[in-house]
Amino acid sequence: MKLQLIAVGTRMPDWVTRGFEEYQRRFPRDMALELIEIPAGKRGKNADIVRILQKEGEQMLAAIPKGNHIVSLDLPGKNWTTPELATALSKWQLDGRDVSLLVGGPEGLAPACKDAAHQSWCLSALTLPHPLVRIVVAESLYRAWSVNTNHPYHRE
């Protein structure tokens, strides 16, 4: 199974790239974590935010391979504990499909992305900067994998 993190934004600070890559490299080959970056629309004083969000959504949906299980990262989503995420990860593996996790930009996800999602995951009730979300998602998925495989990374 492949995990795809599809996120709005391209030029991330080095600490974000290093943090994400640290967890990305820890995944086994049979559960690779891939990052697909979607260029953020230009935002300015007179920007049409609705149109920008729509275009970002179209690009995100176009990046999802046909048949993937889609998980949106959004506030109204399910707030999983680590064991619950580990259970979800196991179910995704048993389902036999790759998984695409969608992270929006500053205004969140386009309605089309929310509608296309099979599940919605809320990382926190806090507002998190979307660059940091990449690292939190990668670490959380790695921790869930470690729970499922009895790897010593996760300790109760």
Swiss-Prot record:
**Does Membrane appear among the keywords?**
no
Cite the EC number. 2.1.1.177
Q: Which reaction does it catalyse?
A: pseudouridine(1915) in 23S rRNA + S-adenosyl-L-methionine = N(3)-methylpseudouridine(1915) in 23S rRNA + S-adenosyl-L-homocysteine + H(+)
SUPFAM superfamilies xref list = alpha/beta knot
Tell me where in or outside the cell this protein is found.
Cytoplasm
Keyword Methyltransferase carried by entry: yes
Q: Name one Pfam family in it.
A: SPOUT_MTase
Which Gene Ontology MF annotations are present?
rRNA (pseudouridine-N3-)-methyltransferase activity
Highest taxon of the lineage: Bacteria
Where S-adenosyl-L-methionine binds, per the record, is at L73, G104, L123, S124, A125, L126, T127, L128
**Alphabetical UniProt keywords:** Cytoplasm, Methyltransferase, rRNA processing, S-adenosyl-L-methionine, Transferase
EC supergroup of this enzyme: transferase
- A cellular-component GO term for this protein: cytoplasm
**InterPro entries recorded for this chain?**
Alpha/beta_knot_MTases (IPR029028), RlmH-like (IPR003742), tRNA_m1G_MTases_N (IPR029026)
Kindly give the Gene3D superfamilies that the UniProt entry links to this protein.
Answer: 3.40.1280.10
The entry sums up its family as follows: Belongs to the RNA methyltransferase RlmH family.
Assembly notes: Homodimer.
The function of this protein is: Specifically methylates the pseudouridine at position 1915 (m3Psi1915) in 23S rRNA.
Quote the NCBIfam families the UniProt record gives.
PRK00103.1-1, PRK00103.1-4, tRNA_RlmH_YbeA
User: Which HAMAP family does its entry note?
Assistant: 23SrRNA_methyltr_H (MF_00658)
Entry's PANTHER family? METHYLTRANSFERASE, RIBOSOMAL RNA LARGE SUBUNIT METHYLTRANSFERASE H
Output this protein's name: Ribosomal RNA large subunit methyltransferase H
- Which gene is transcribed and translated to give this protein? rlmH
